[in-house]
């Protein structure tokens, strides 16, 4: 689904699940090569020719070490390779179980990205994790420049396939489980945001911790996006958006409280646009995980900003770059956005009333009192946890 067409497989016992899955895939050419060094350079040549990552598979132990020269060559010459090394589970490591070495970060600093996957588990949550990790690995092998990605995959026995009716497997997946997987990356010099996927829908913009070089330009860009789509903006306390709140009438700061209310059931969006990191609010994160709607992540960095492993699509550009050449349109406030803004106003009044009537001092009230009484524009430094 990402776009892989070729897998080079070095046969071995521990990599049996990978070999069979790739060999049985109708759209992947699986090529078996016994010698690992030869296989790795063949995969390198194939990737050079196609411009797409070639998947290279081997079993546990020293097999993966034979890929090392090709890994260095691929990284130095900018060739996309995705290496899958099978491994024994944790309980069979460091105990002379045989055909076992430390395969974590086997190739040092040469890969663009590397990680060890969790043990396979037939649950929707873990399959979502696997889906998003594979999508991220594919993107890392191609962007910002082509190179090597190494995934270490532990497997427990039994390694051979277990017969299971296809219908049982298919019922585990929601109809849109694979919908957000795209087989290409946006062009490096121009990011085309999917306005047609967003306009006319109920949606939110969420913005986490950010330290942009030009905070006002960053806030103006998000305010522009918000008002063009009539999407409310749920802004992290440590985001500069709250310092420039006058730029955007759709700014929501009390979302953590709003999402604890019964009214949150009526606020489920069709689209979520995430700018940078997720806000730290556990309430927001749990809500996003429960609703699991398509999420579009906009950030210039190539990191994976999806700890929820949801249906995400990444745009590797800053929010200001992403909105270059976008023409403004006059759009009225949508009923969905009005709901959020109304709840924001009500919740703010309730919070102020509660803190005003509260006689006992605590961290939350101290921060609120300071913000109410200091002159506008006065810098305030708040420590961790409750006060923030």
Question: How would you describe each model-predicted region?
Answer:
Residues 287-388:
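Phosphate/pyrophosphate-binding active-site segments
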Residues 207-296, 304:
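Glycine-rich, anion-gripping cofactor-binding loops and their flanking helix/strand elements
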Residues 33, 113-119, 250-259, 312-326:
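Short acidic-hydrophobic, aromatic-tinged amphipathic segments that line or gate anion-handling sites
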Residues 136, 140-200:
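Conformationally flexible catalytic loops at phosphate/diphosphate-handling active centers
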Residues 1-4, 46-51, 140-145, 191-204, ...:
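Glycine-rich phosphate/diphosphate-binding loops that line cofactor/substrate pockets in enzymes
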Residues 99-147, 322-323, 328, 334:
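Conserved thiamine diphosphate
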Residues 16-91, 280, 388:
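Thiamine diphosphate
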């Amino acid at each position: 689904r990402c776009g892989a067409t070729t897998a080079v497989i070095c046969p071995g016992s521990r990599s049996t699940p990978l070999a069979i899955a790739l060999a049985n895939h109708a759209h992947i050419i699986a090529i078996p090569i016994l010698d690992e060094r030869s296989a790795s350079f063949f995969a390198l040549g194939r990737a050079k020719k196609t411009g797409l990552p070639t998947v290279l598979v081997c079993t546990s132990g020293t097999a993966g070490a034979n890929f090392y020269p090709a890994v260095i060559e691929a990284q130095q010459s900018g060739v996309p390779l995705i290496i899958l090394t099978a491994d024994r589970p944790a309980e069979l490591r460091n105990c002379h179980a045989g055909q076992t070495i430390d395969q974590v970060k086997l190739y040092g600093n040469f890969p663009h990205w590397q990680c060890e996957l969790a043990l396979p588990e037939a649950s929707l949550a873990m399959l979502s994790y696997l889906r998003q990790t594979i999508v991220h690995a594919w993107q890392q092998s191609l962007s910002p420049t082509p190179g090597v990605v190494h995934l270490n995959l532990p497997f427990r026995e039994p390694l051979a396939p277990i017969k299971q009716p296809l219908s049982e497997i298919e019922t585990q997946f929601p109809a849109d489980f694979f919908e957000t997987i795209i087989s290409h990356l946006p062009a490096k010099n121009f990011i085309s945001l999917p306005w047609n996927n967003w306009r006319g829908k109920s949606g939110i913009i969420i913005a986490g911790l950010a330290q942009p070089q030009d905070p006002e330009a960053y806030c103006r860009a998000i305010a522009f996006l918000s008002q063009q789509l009539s999407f409310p903006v749920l802004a992290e306390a440590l985001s500069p958006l709250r310092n420039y709140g006058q730029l955007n009438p759709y700014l929501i700061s009390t979302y953590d409280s709003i999402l604890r209310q019964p009214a949150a059931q009526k606020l489920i969006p069709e689209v979520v646009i995430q700018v940078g990191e997720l806000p730290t609010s556990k309430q927001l994160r749990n809500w996003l995980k429960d609703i699991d709607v398509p999420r579009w992540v906009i950030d210039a960095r190539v990191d994976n900003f999806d700890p929820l492993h949801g249906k995400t699509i990444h745009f590797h550009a800053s929010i200001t770059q992403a909105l270059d050449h976008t023409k403004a349109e006059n759009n009225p406030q949508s009923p969905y956005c009005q709901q959020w803004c109304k709840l924001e106003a009500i919740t703010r009044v309730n919070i102020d009333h509660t803190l005003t009537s509260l006689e006992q001092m605590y961290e939350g009230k101290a921060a609120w009192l300071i913000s109410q009484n200091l002159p506008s524009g006065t810098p305030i430094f708040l420590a961790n946890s409750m006060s923030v």
